């Protein structure tokens, strides 16, 4: 059966997207030390602990400089909102500040406001059935984002729907999304080398 993807989502997924580590969920247990280390980094970053934001900021800054060169200084970094307002602040505030310091990229963190919590993606699953995802209420500073070139960051990409939905909201605000960067991309099969 062919999976149909909404063309607005596909439009964002067709842009330049990159990730730094392969992320294997905890239920995938037969993995090597490299995958375990990547998993620990993702968890530490998501939980805002062990100064993981510094390691991820360094990876992000290096990628931005290699990908965009001096152009990065005229761009803005924005992170996909987390399901809970307090997690958005604890996970991304210092990270965005640090990436901005390292690269000169504009910091879009304070221009996104999470107004209402929502269920996280994992809590929408019920066995093989998924419950309907509730749209998250966020406020974007449309004046700030208008005509800006944006790079969107998220911690983990699985289907890309959260990233694409947020990128579309940014573009509805007048921004031009260049693509997305992710700390990890979800994988389910580990290949030993």
Question: Can you say where each PLM-predicted feature lies in the sequence?
Answer:
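Short catalytic/ligand-binding loop motif for oxyanion handling, primarily in non-cytosolic enzymes
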Residues: 85-89, 118-120, 188-189
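Charged helix-capping and loop-helix junction motifs
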Residues: 91-97
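Long C-terminal interaction/binding lobes of large macromolecular proteins
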Residues: 140-141, 148-151, 165-170
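PRPP-dependent phosphoribosyltransferase catalytic core
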Residues: 2-11, 164-193
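Short, well-ordered alpha-helices that flank and scaffold nucleotide-derived cofactor binding pockets
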Residues: 62, 97, 101, 168, ...
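Active-site-facing substrate-recognition patch
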Residues: 1-72, 76, 113-146, 185-186
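Short beta-strand-loop/turn "lid" adjacent to the catalytic site in phosphate-handling enzymes
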Residues: 76-91
